[in-house]
């Protein structure tokens, strides 16, 4: 019940700021999609919904791109939870944004897929387009696995649609 209450206020949070907020460094993303999109057995695929925060004020410019920290979490339709923090690169090609990321995190299977370990690693690629100066709509594809450090390592591939807003 509390989860549904929280979801009801996400749109308020996203659209309550003035459009000139694009100069600020905080970026909040909400996303929804499919967990275990390449499920060969057909019994673990489910929906996922998540939220992610990026603080662009903490970026580092390097010779291979601009990097900033990212923190987020998602829950699946089978009560699996993944909480993560990592690093994301940003490559802006006009209105198109490409953002690869890597994040270790804590995974709890709930009634969903057993990934073999509580420590799981998420690698992701996002491709988005700027809707306004401070809003972006994108597609992301991620892979989560434990690098064979767990009892088993089935991994999972996920895809989602992401809406991001700068505050």
What positions do the PLM features span?
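Residue-level signature of outer-membrane beta-barrel architecture
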Residues: 53-57, 89-91, 129, 143, ...
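Outer-membrane beta-barrel initiation region
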Residues: 22-56
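Membrane-embedded beta-strands that build the outer-membrane beta-barrel scaffold
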Residues: 51, 87, 98, 125-127, ...
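Short loop/turn motifs that connect adjacent beta-strands in outer-membrane beta-barrel proteins
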Residues: 19-25, 41, 56-67, 92-98, ...
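Transmembrane beta-strand segments that form the barrel wall of outer-membrane beta-barrel proteins
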Residues: 28-36, 64-76, 99-108, 140-145
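Outer-membrane beta-barrel "beta-signal"
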Residues: 47-51, 129, 154-167
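Solvent-exposed loop/turn segments connecting transmembrane beta-strands
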Residues: 37-47, 73-84, 111-118, 148-156
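Cleavable N-terminal export/targeting peptides
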Residues: 1-25
């Amino acid at each position: 019940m509390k989860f549904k209450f929280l979801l009801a206020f996400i749109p308020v949070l996203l659209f309550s700021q003035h459009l000139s907020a694009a100069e600020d460094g905080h970026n909040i993303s909400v996303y929804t999609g499919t967990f275990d999109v390449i499920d060969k057995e057909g019994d673990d695929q489910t929906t996922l919904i998540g939220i992610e925060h990026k603080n662009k004020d903490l970026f580092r410019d390097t010779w291979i791109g601009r990097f900033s920290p990212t923190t987020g979490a998602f829950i699946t339709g089978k009560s699996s939870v993944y909480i993560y923090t990592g690093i994301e690169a940003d490559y802006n090609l006009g209105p198109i944004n490409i953002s690869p990321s890597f994040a270790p995190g804590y995974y709890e299977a709930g009634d969903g897929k057993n990934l073999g370990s509580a420590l799981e690693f998420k690698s992701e690629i996002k491709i988005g387009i700027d809707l306004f100066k401070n809003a972006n709509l994108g597609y992301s594809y991620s892979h989560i696995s434990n690098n064979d450090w767990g009892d088993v390592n089935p991994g999972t591939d996920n895809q989602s649609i992401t809406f991001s807003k700068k505050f």
